[in-house]
From Swiss-Prot:
Keyword hit for Ubl conjugation: no
Keyword Transmembrane: no
Similarity field: Belongs to the UPF0401 family.
Swiss-Prot/TrEMBL keywords: Plasmid
The name this protein goes by in its record: UPF0401 protein YubL
InterPro entries per record: DUF905, YkfF-like_sf
Pfam (any one): DUF905
Superkingdom of origin organism: Bacteria
Length: 80
């Protein structure tokens, strides 16, 4: 039975990240979303019970490191 096996999680790459990479990560979680999408710049936000836990702009140096850590500890994975 492989019905309960979930696919490996995608995480943000080192350095800056693209809109497509942010979408791929956000699509895996119930509480991770893209906000303030300005085309080339966007903010990825992690929430818990509706309150912001962490946020990072896609151009922020080192932002992906803290976002990945926060998503790992606070992300609520969508069921497949």
């Amino acid at each position: 039975m492989t019905d309960n096996i979930m696919s490996p999680l995608k995480s943000l790459p080192d350095g800056t990240f693209t809109h497509e990479q942010a979408e791929a990560v956000a699509a895996q979680y119930q509480n991770v979303a893209i906000e303030d999408d300005q085309g080339t710049h966007l903010r990825l936000v992690v929430r818990k019970d509706g309150e912001m836990v962490w946020r990072g702009w896609n151009f922020e140096p080192g932002g992906e490191y803290w976002l990945n850590r926060c998503i790992e500890s606070h992300g609520i994975r969508k069921t497949q």
